[in-house]
């Protein structure tokens, strides 16, 4: 029998207070078992059902667990131990799912990283996390990830192994596909029982998520088996996931949203099927929806707009199986939201979440005005919300303010980041999200901007998202982003970047007219409009205001 002692909490982990943890346990939110155990138990209920589709690969639950458990014991054979950090930088592929589950079964901590990361980002994550292993493709989109991983590993003494998926695995790398070969039936049963016995406890850290911040390198968020299992299960319940669910994973699996919101892991916990797409392009996604009879997916607003436009141009694809489309990561304009149901034939669900915990969803039975105009409400009855003014006083219903939260799946601090914790968390455990929201009488949140997303024009503080909200009311404007244009007289003037529908033309005067008709203060009117084919995004998929400010700054110099 191979049993391991409980893995020590990473040195930088901030636990919930004992009395709070006891309350969440008594409420039934925290079950005291590992996420890997929950996934294994779900798989045993439907062993022959197909659970994972990736191109020609069609994997049953029994095969998935035979591969994940096989990978777990082989990783252990490499010297990877519980609480070791494993950076997973893979594109959307079946190996991403298997190696994540292997880590969860072993007790190692996966850290999902985007394939777009290069030396600066990847080395930053590896160094901060003190990672033991890197998991990468050999080459992806003509970039040699294997070479980069070894370059990073050579500079970070904690990294002992580079695991590589692909056909060109170097002798000094570990062949990931060989590592993920399935155990035979007898061996699978023996290893499964062994891993069940040595599974991490619920209060132990399950994974480190990367924060979605746009300043500097992402921070690390330590999520426990208790809190993460509860969040995923509760989200799956709100979304109505079950054995008939067929989830299309079209967003990069380097993000948390398509994995845990409820996403891939929520689908597997519910006994459903995950279909992996390597591209969000409508041609590829619609073909998979039609072939696999997809019932649910999660996307970002930019993808929604591409899909709607494609649907207008080519209405032939059979999307009749699609029941639910989650949209999150950035604000979905109501004008776009209203088109989803009529054009794509499915229910829209707005999503507002963060790596730090809080997850808000509109509900399947919400009226259309709630779904179109709000970003939903927290999924747990024990999620706590405060909306406050700059002095920390609670504002009234409908008034904008800064969002603070705490709850059974919102950790009490970042991993090993005391200075960030001092800024982002109050002494009594409230997380300062940095979001500006309004709370409706029925408890839904409307995200109106970011606390730092303000333009200072001659001392007047202008919320950029307010300007953007007016801009997208102009016919032909698909996306808008307002930033401050440096100005020697006023400090900043308002510069508006827009993305237009094909064949349309929009002038600055068109936006100003909409704002003037709404009797908006004159100091909020944009003074420059720039059309782009697309808005730049951060590695976490959010609109990159820093890049736009830099572009605006260069323009002010010419």
Swiss-Prot record:
EC number(s) recorded for this UniProt protein? 6.2.1.43
Q: Name one Pfam family in it.
A: AMP-binding_C
- Role played: Catalyzes the activation of 2-hydroxy-7-methoxy-5-methyl-1-naphthoate in the biosynthesis of the naphthoate moiety of the neocarzinostatin chromophore. Also catalyzes the activation of other 1-naphthoic acid analogs such as 2-hydroxy-5-methyl-1-naphthoate or 2,7-dihydroxy-5-methyl-1-naphthoate in vitro.
Catalyzed chemical reaction(s):
2-hydroxy-7-methoxy-5-methyl-1-naphthoate + ATP + CoA = 2-hydroxy-7-methoxy-5-methyl-1-naphthoyl-CoA + AMP + diphosphate
Q: What class of enzyme is it?
A: ligase
GO terms under biological process: antibiotic biosynthetic process; fatty acid metabolic process
Family that this chain belongs to: Belongs to the ATP-dependent AMP-binding enzyme family.
Species this protein is from: Streptomyces carzinostaticus
Give, as in the UniProt entry, the pathway in which the protein acts: Antibiotic biosynthesis
Task: List the InterPro entries hit by this protein, alphabetically.
Answer: AMP-bd_C, AMP-bd_C_sf, AMP-binding_CS, AMP-dep_synth/lig_dom
- GO MF annotations for this entry? acid-thiol ligase activity; ATP binding; medium-chain fatty acid-CoA ligase activity
The source's domain of life comes to Bacteria
User: Residues that bind ATP, according to the entry?
Assistant: 212-213, 329-331, 351, 435, 450, 542
Asked whether the keyword ATP-binding is assigned, the reply is yes
Query: Keywords, A to Z?
Result: Antibiotic biosynthesis, ATP-binding, Ligase, Nucleotide-binding
Name under which the protein is recorded: 2-hydroxy-7-methoxy-5-methyl-1-naphthoate--CoA ligase
């Amino acid at each position: 029998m191979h049993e391991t002692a409980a893995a020590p909490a990473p040195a930088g982990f901030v636990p919930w207070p004992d009395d709070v943890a006891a309350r969440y346990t008594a409420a039934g939110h925290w079950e005291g078992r590992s996420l890997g155990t929950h996934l294994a138990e779900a798989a045993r209920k439907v062993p022959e059902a197909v659970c994972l589709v990736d191109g020609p690969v069609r994997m049953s639950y029994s095969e998935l667990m035979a591969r994940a458990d096989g990978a777990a014991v082989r990783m252990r054979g490499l010297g990877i131990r519980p609480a070791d950090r494993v950076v997973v930088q893979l594109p959307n592929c079946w190996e991403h799912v298997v190696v994540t589950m292997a880590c969860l079964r072993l007790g190692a901590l996966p850290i999902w990283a985007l394939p777009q990361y290069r030396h600066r980002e990847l080395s930053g994550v590896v160094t901060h996390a003190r990672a033991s292993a890197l998991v990468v493709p050999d080459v992806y989109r003509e970039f040699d990830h294997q070479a980069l991983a070894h370059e990073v590993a050579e500079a970070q003494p904690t990294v002992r192994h580079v695991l590589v998926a692909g056909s060109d695995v170097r002798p000094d790398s570990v062949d990931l596909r060989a590592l993920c070969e399935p155990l035979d039936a007898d061996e699978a049963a023996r290893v499964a029982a062994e891993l069940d016995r040595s599974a991490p406890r619920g209060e132990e850290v399950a994974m480190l998520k990367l924060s979605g911040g746009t300043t500097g390198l992402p921070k690390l968020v330590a999520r426990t088996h208790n809190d993460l299992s509860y969040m995923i299960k509760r989200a799956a319940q709100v979304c109505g996931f079950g054995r008939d669910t067929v989830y299309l994973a079209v967003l990069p699996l380097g993000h948390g949203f398509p994995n845990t919101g409820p996403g891939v892991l929520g689908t597997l916990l519910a006994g459903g099927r995950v279909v992996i797409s390597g591209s969000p392009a409508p041609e590829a996604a619609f073909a998979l929806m039609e072939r696999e009879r997809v019932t649910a997916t999660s996307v970002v607003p930019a993808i929604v707009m591409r899909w709607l436009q494609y649907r207008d141009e080519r209405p032939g694809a059979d999307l009749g199986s699609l029941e639910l489309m989650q949209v999150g990561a950035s604000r979905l304009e109501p004008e776009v939201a209203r088109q989803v149901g009529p054009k794509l034939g499915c229910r829209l669900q707005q999503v507002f979440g963060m790596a730090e915990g809080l997850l808000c969803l509109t509900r399947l039975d919400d009226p259309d005005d709630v779904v179109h105009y709000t970003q939903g409400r927290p999924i747990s009855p024990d999620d706590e919300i405060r909306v406050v003014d700059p002095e920390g006083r609670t504002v009234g219903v409908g008034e904008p303010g800064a969002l603070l939260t705490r709850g059974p799946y919102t950790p009490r601090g970042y991993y090993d980041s005391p200075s960030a914790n001092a800024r982002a968390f109050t002494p009594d455990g409230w997380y300062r999200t940095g979001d500006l929201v309004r709370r409706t009488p029925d408890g839904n949140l409307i995200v109106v901007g970011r606390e730092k997303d303000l333009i200072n024009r001659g001392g007047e503080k202008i919320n950029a998202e307010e300007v953007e909200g007016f801009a997208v009311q102009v016919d032909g404007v698909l996306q808008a982003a307002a930033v401050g244009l440096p100005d020697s007289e006023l400090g900043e003037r308002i510069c508006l970047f827009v993305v237009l529908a094909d064949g349309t033309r929009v002038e600055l005067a068109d936006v100003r007219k909409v704002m003037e008709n709404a009797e908006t203060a004159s100091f909020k009117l944009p003074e420059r409009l720039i059309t782009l084919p697309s808005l730049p995004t951060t590695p976490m998929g959010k609109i990159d205001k820093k890049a736009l400010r830099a572009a605006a700054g260069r323009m002010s110099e010419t």
